[in-house]
Regions:
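Formylglycine-dependent sulfatase
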Residues: 1-219
Length: 219
């Protein structure tokens, strides 16, 4: 994750030179300040799903109320309808945060897909024989997916490597929305702890939780 060199030639700069008005709204995630854009309103780093911050062109940061997908969409529509120079052609980059890990759904979709079982990929139990780089990469769902950060099976008092990061993300919810969020996932976490899953059963549980939340985020 280096810093993007904004001084180099880029497509937005070429579009500006050709007479286009340029804008980017949403995830930038390149550390440096956007160049070649007449307008930008971007998320810090990859941003947050709930009540996200946005970096404005004057360098200030504004916390917006709502779900990030809706906010980015609304900001894009607002720029097209009210803020651009309609005498010029334009190019607008709409960079959604979704479906970046971790997958935190809009609250109205919390219960979507909960009765759906997603088919396991044919290579789900691949042992990566003969592929040392793939075998040593910490990207296997069963072994490496964080039970709190990725599947939201939070246990009070217990910590994983990414527990604090997870709590920071959901901590952006107001008290009413947080109560709704916790009511849903806490019941799943209690059931998960009671089942004491291990091995393949645990790996497949993680996969189903991942897929259900992923589907909610992209809905």
């Amino acid at each position: 994750h280096g810093i993007f060199d904004g001084s180099q030639q880029t497509m937005p700069k070429l579009m500006q030179k050709a007479g286009y008005q340029t804008a980017i709204i949403g995830k930038w995630h390149l550390v440096s300040t956007p160049t070649g854009f007449d307008y930008y309103n971007i998320l810090p780093a990859q941003g947050d799903y709930y009540n996200p911050n946005f970096i404005n062109m004057d360098g200030t940061t504004t916390r917006e109320k709502g779900y990030v997908t809706n906010i980015i969409t609304d900001k894009a529509i607002d720029w097209m309808e009210h803020k651009r120079d309609k005498s010029k052609p334009f190019i607008l980059f709409i960079h959604h945060k979704a479906c970046h890990r971790a997958w935190l759904p809009e609250l109205k979709y919390l219960r979507e897909y909960e009765d759906k079982t997603f088919e396991l990929p044919a290579n789900f139990y691949d042992d990566y024989e003969g592929r040392e780089a793939a075998k040593t990469a910490e990207m296997q769902i069963g072994k490496h997916m964080d039970i709190v950060y990725d599947t939201k099976m939070f246990t009070p008092g217990a910590k994983t490597y990414l527990t604090d990061t997870y709590l920071g993300m959901v901590g952006r919810l107001n008290s009413r929305d947080r109560a709704e969020y916790d009511f849903f996932y806490d019941s799943l976490a209690i059931d998960f702890r009671n089942r004491k899953l291990t091995g393949k059963a645990l790996a497949e549980f993680k996969y189903q939780r991942y897929m259900r939340d992923y589907a909610k985020v992209v809905k």
